[in-house]
């Protein structure tokens, strides 16, 4: 989750990822009943991880782990603060653990992960799926009058410190 939209605030430049123990979550499993959805679950997450992205609109749209590159990909909508470049894609090292440190503006100490790279790649907010071997299905959203749609394309991740995507 995140606090976003208010460009006057200085404490809304992080996304917050809640971490839960997958094994512990099993005791809350229930069959889906659309007429009476359950709301069971743990009282608290195991951890809150703050991810510095700068201000974004609507927070994280897609978070995907790519086992081939061992990176997390985070797709967001551009933010509105002029102090940030507001890239739509962030990369995080999947092998680095978050570290406790003071977050900007408030000085409060939290678990924090910093991005290892960014990309100006403008798709992925409405869908991204790692397929392995550097291949991804990535959504291109659009609108035709009142109808919204998404086309899915196959992409290859480029190599390097700050990878990008090439359509296959």
Region roles according to the model:
Residues 1, 69-74, 134-138:
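Entry beta-strands of beta-propeller and related beta-repeat scaffolds
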Residues 1-60:
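Eukaryote-skewed repeat-based solenoidal scaffolds used as protein-protein interaction platforms
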Residues 1-4, 64-66, 129:
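Hydrophobic, aliphatic-enriched repeat segments that assemble into extended interaction scaffolds
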Residues 3-7, 77-80, 141-144:
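Residue-level signature of beta-propeller blades and closely related beta-rich strand-turn architectures
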Residues 10-33, 85-105, 149-167:
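Beta-propeller blade signature
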Residues 49-118, 126:
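Loop/turn-rich, solvent-exposed surfaces of beta-rich toroidal or solenoidal domains
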Residues 125-168:
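Blade-level signature of beta-propeller repeat domains, shared across WD40, Kelch, NHL, RCC1
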């Amino acid at each position: 989750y995140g606090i976003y939209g208010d460009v006057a605030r200085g404490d809304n430049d992080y996304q917050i990822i809640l971490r839960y123990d997958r094994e512990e979550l099993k005791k809350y499993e229930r069959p889906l009943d659309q007429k009476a959805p359950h709301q069971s679950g743990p009282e608290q997450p195991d951890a809150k991880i703050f991810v510095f992205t700068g201000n974004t609109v609507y927070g994280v749209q897609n978070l995907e782990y790519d086992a081939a590159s061992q990176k997390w990909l985070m797709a967001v909508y551009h933010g509105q603060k002029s102090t940030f470049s507001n890239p739509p894609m962030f990369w995080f090292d999947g092998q680095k653990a978050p570290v406790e440190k003071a977050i900007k503006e408030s000085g409060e100490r939290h678990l924090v992960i910093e991005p290892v790279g960014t990309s100006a790649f403008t798709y992925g907010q409405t869908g991204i799926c790692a397929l392995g071997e550097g291949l991804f299905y990535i959504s291109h959203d659009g609108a035709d009058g009142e109808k919204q749609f998404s086309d899915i394309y196959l992409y290859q991740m480029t190599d390097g410190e700050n990878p990008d995507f090439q359509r296959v």
